[in-house]
């Protein structure tokens, strides 16, 4: 309704589609990685594909974030970020028919920690629709020190909540409930070893400290480095980087995925469940030289325990899906609900954004990936495309600012 306000899709791992592929949630005055919590223009809308893409307002207040659509597509949830004003976050549930909104719960403190300063812009809902998980920064109760990051789980009916995970290195959790009905408690998480991202306070002022690790260690800057554990504090081999785990939503039952942080292969920080299965796909980074690298798509099965090794993990199975595409430069991706189709963006050596689509076979098979669309140069469209598929796999969605304005796009595949 305002051509001067940018719009885009919500991050590709978000649960924002109805299972029949007829409706989805998107937002305006946002960018592909989130939004400004103080921007009143940032709002969520419901897009109805059966009604020519008509948009219906879902929110009308400042501070909306972390949306989720229930697995049956009938209930929409979002959170209100009141961290800076009241030190809390509020779970809300608007009626999709009447628009009337009700408060379902408030997260303030678990007795030791309270949410603070940073709200991860995505939530994730369990496959039985009973619980939602979010991630925030943490501060100790009645203290101005904000030393850690945490994963909260809230019951959508009772409003009861628990802090199930916390630590300095959980700054970018990419939390994702498994969508398999038989695994309603399993959550995929990301552990950024070496990351701190501390927020420091000086009186009433606060600021972001240095030390965030997205995928590599803080000093890498795409330099070729060996990443491994070392007992020598002066060693260059730090053990920094990220790896992936699956945990239960009570904080127990750790499992590990056989990928990354072995000195050769790094996780990029983009991963998702393969449809409604219990397998996970992640994008990796392997340096050929200090300035050149390939980015593969790897499918994995987890194994029990909280350990960190790649190919020597007993019981851990993996398959390089993108091995038939040379060179591989896959970054952000998603599958359909059945886990039989995939879409990914691809940054070519000449700086062009490409869109690839394809089919997935049995565990062990290479993906049938093929070039589908040129999305333009990264110079003209620097924002990440973050593509994903409708649950039925018939539509692909991506972001682009090639026109001069960031917008959300849809591509009919069949």
Describe the function of each predicted region.
Residues 258-264, 320-333, 364-389:
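Conserved blade-ending motifs and adjacent loop-strand segments that build the rim/top face
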């Amino acid at each position: 309704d305002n051509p001067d306000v940018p719009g885009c899709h919500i991050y590709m791992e978000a649960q924002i589609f109805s299972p029949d592929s007829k409706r989805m949630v998107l937002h305006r005055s946002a960018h592909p990685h989130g939004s400004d919590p103080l921007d009143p223009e940032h709002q969520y809308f419901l897009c109805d594909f059966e009604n020519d893409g008509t948009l219906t307002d879902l929110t009308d207040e400042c501070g909306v974030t972390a949306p989720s659509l229930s697995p049956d597509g009938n209930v929409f949830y979002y959170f209100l970020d009141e961290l800076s004003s009241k030190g809390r976050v509020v779970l809300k549930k608007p009626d999709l028919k009447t628009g009337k909104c009700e408060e379902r719960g408030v997260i303030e403190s678990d007795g030791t920690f309270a949410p603070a300063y940073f709200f991860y812009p995505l939530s994730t809902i369990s496959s039985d629709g009973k619980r939602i998980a979010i991630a925030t920064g943490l501060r100790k109760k009645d203290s101005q020190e904000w030393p850690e990051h945490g994963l909260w789980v809230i019951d959508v009916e009772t409003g009861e909540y628990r802090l199930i995970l916390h630590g300095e290195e959980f700054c970018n959790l990419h939390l994702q409930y498994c969508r398999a009905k038989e695994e309603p408690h399993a959550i995929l998480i990301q552990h950024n070893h070496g990351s701190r991202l501390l927020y420091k306070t000086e009186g009433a002022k606060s600021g972001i400290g240095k030390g965030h690790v997205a995928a590599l260690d803080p000093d890498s800057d795409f330099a070729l480095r060996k990443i491994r554990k070392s007992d020598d504090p002066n060693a260059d081999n730090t053990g920094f980087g990220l790896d992936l785990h699956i945990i239960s939503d009570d904080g127990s039952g750790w499992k590990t995925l056989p990928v990354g942080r072995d000195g050769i292969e790094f996780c990029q920080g983009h991963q998702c469940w393969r449809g409604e299965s219990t397998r996970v796909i992640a994008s990796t980074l392997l340096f050929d030289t200090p300035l050149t690298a390939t980015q593969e798509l790897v499918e994995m099965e987890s194994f029990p325990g909280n350990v960190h090794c790649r190919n020597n993990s007993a019981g851990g199975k993996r398959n390089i899906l993108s091995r038939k595409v040379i060179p591989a430069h896959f970054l952000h991706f998603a599958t359909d609900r059945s886990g039989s189709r995939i879409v990914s963006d691809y940054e070519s050596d000449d700086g062009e954004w490409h869109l690839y689509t394809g089919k997935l076979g049995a565990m062990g098979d290479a993906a049938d990936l093929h070039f589908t669309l040129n999305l333009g140069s990264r110079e003209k469209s620097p924002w990440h495309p973050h593509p994903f598929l409708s649950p039925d796999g018939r539509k692909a969605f991506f972001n682009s600012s090639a026109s001069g304005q960031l917008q959300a796009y849809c591509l009919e595949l069949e």
